[in-house]
């Protein structure tokens, strides 16, 4: 179980980790441990919907966003800001950024190539 970056939730996360207690889904959703709360029959369709949406996005921007999300908290503020600026430069100068902008102008879905 990954700890939330919101310090207010550390107490609940610590309790669950240390006691091994279970949490009901509605409480997990209310506390922000879950992004979505769906019926069991809707779990796979909802998961696939989100996965397709992510897969349709610009690969470079998604890769860099993941890097900043997962590694960003490990760095001091100055380093994190430099990394964010570098990621933005890479993203804004990529082919995919131009393709995304052009697709918006042309009212069509972008065809990202990961470059």
Region locations from a protein language model:
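Crotonase-fold acyl-CoA enzyme core
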Residues: 1-60, 93-94, 98-102, 108, ...
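Helix-loop "lid/cap" segments that line or gate small-molecule binding pockets
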Residues: 16, 68, 87-91
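Short, charged, surface-exposed hinge/linker loops at domain edges
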Residues: 69-75
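Short active-site-adjacent structural elements
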Residues: 72, 112-113
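Short beta-strand->loop
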Residues: 76-81
């Amino acid at each position: 179980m990954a700890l939330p970056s919101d310090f207010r939730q550390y107490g609940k996360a610590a309790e669950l980790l240390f006691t091994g207690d279970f949490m009901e889904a509605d409480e997990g959703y209310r506390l922000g441990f879950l992004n979505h709360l769906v019926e069991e029959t809707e779990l796979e369709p909802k998961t696939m919907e989100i996965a397709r949406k992510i897969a349709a996005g610009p690969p470079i921007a998604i890769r860099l966003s993941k890097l900043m999300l997962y590694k960003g908290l490990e760095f001091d503020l100055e380093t994190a800001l430099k990394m964010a600026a570098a990621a933005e430069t890479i993203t804004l100068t990529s082919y995919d950024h131009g393709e995304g902008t052009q697709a918006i102008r042309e009212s069509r879905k972008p065809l990202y190539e990961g470059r």
